[in-house]
């Protein structure tokens, strides 16, 4: 059975790949039928849809970083693991604008064909302080 520490390692691999603009590695971690809720007002219903969006979004930045804070990782059974965390994103766009976002992430990992894949992902911004 996979341990919560191993699931946390997979989540870290995801964060590192995203922060390094390695879209291929991020997409490689997704199940074909992944569902993703991101910072846009619609849902992605499969890997191909999200890959197209992600490629365009990452391509808008010359540099970026991404990290998880306070990850909570747990196994539901021998085929499902969940990671909840706060996330921090910083990037510089091609026109030199700095973007900093703080949010929440939930990644659900499922065993698919002997491999752990992200089967569901939810990214949402933290409320702005008033």
Where are these regions (language model features)?
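Basic/polar N-terminal segments that are highly enriched at the extreme N-terminus
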Residues: 1-5, 129-130
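A solvent-exposed, acidic/Ser-Thr-rich amphipathic alpha-helical stretch
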Residues: 4-5, 23-79, 100
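Short structured motifs
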Residues: 11, 66-72, 86, 104
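Short, cysteine-centered beta-strand-loop-beta hairpins and adjacent loop/turn segments enriched
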Residues: 60, 89-99, 127
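A short hydrophobic beta-strand element
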Residues: 79-89
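Short beta-strand edge/turn micro-motifs at domain boundaries
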Residues: 102-129
């Amino acid at each position: 059975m996979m341990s919560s520490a191993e699931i946390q390692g997979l989540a870290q691999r995801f964060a590192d790949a995203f922060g390094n603009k390695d879209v291929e590695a991020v997409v490689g971690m997704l199940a074909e039928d992944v569902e993703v809720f991101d910072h846009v007002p619609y849902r992605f219903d499969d890997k191909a849809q999200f890959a197209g969006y992600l490629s365009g979004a990452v391509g808008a930045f010359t540099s970026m970083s991404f990290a998880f804070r306070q990850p909570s990782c747990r196994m539901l059974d021998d085929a499902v693991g969940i990671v909840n965390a706060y996330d921090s994103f910083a990037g510089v766009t091609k026109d030199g604008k700095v973007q900093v976002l703080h949010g929440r992430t939930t990644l659900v990992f499922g065993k698919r064909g002997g491999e752990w894949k992200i089967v569901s992902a939810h990214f949402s911004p933290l409320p702005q302080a008033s």
